[in-house]
From Swiss-Prot:
Highest taxon listed in the record's lineage: Eukaryota
Entry's family note: Belongs to the FARP (FMRFamide related peptide) family.
Annotated positions of the Phenylalanine amide modification: 9
Record protein name field: FMRFamide-like neuropeptide AF5
């Protein structure tokens, strides 16, 4: 749920 989709979807 943020900008880094590879860390937090």
């Amino acid at each position: 749920s943020g900008k880094p989709t590879f860390i937090r979807f």
